[in-house]
Amino acid sequence: IELNNRINENLEQQAQAIFKSWFVDFEPFSGVMPEDWKVGNLLDIADYLNGLAMQKFRPNENENSLPVLKIKELRQGFCDNTSDVCSENIKSEYIIHNGDVIFSWSGSLLVDFWCGGTCGLNQHLFKVTSEKYSKWFYYSWTQYHLQKFISIAKDMATTMGHIKREELKKSEVLIPNSGNYSKIGNLLSPIYDMIIANRIENKRIAELRDTLLPKLM
């Protein structure tokens, strides 16, 4: 588990360096953005779906349940026996699976790949998806703007600083031509796939350990 965590830390640094090289420093283009790249915003490249108020979707007596993904679960990376539960019959778009990109936009702001198994999406969390663009692209750009979002939330008068949808619209993204998009995707996509696979493996190992340890004692 420790080794996988160290590998993932290294992979995350590599991914950020590649992103910066192409999208911030324009190193492959002698420091100048190519003319055929477009400028857009986060809402142009992805959908940000806010979760449900899950207390309204408790399971009925004879219904199967799902754990609820809240900010606490996102931070710790898994659901546990203290997590709330919801009906498994909620709309499918609110059901989260391994590898989904989740953006906590209220309170503790963070964006991450969820690798803690199937669960229901609570309010104050966005599920980030796109029909047009790949996961590496919308994850990287949301991550890129995260520090700015944290500063905006901090400056709010309320204790629960949060990000409004208009802030997503104000957040600029650069959209490469299809050739460059494929090239960058070939570099970043495998890195993020590996990070997700390592996290899922860590969860499996931890569950195995927790099952076996009591039997060995």
Where in this protein do the model-derived segments appear?
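A short beta-sheet element
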Residues: 70, 87-147, 153-158, 164-165
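Short, charged, solvent-exposed linker or helix-capping segments at domain edges/interfaces
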Residues: 80-81, 139, 183
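Non-catalytic DNA-recognition/assembly elements of restriction-modification systems
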Residues: 1-53, 76, 174, 178-217
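Proline-centric
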Residues: 125-135, 151, 161, 166-196, ...
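Sequence-specific dsDNA recognition surfaces
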Residues: 40-58, 65-98, 120-121
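Hydrophobic/aromatic residues in well-formed alpha-helices
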Residues: 42-45, 138, 168
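Structured core elements
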Residues: 68-70, 102-103, 127, 172, ...
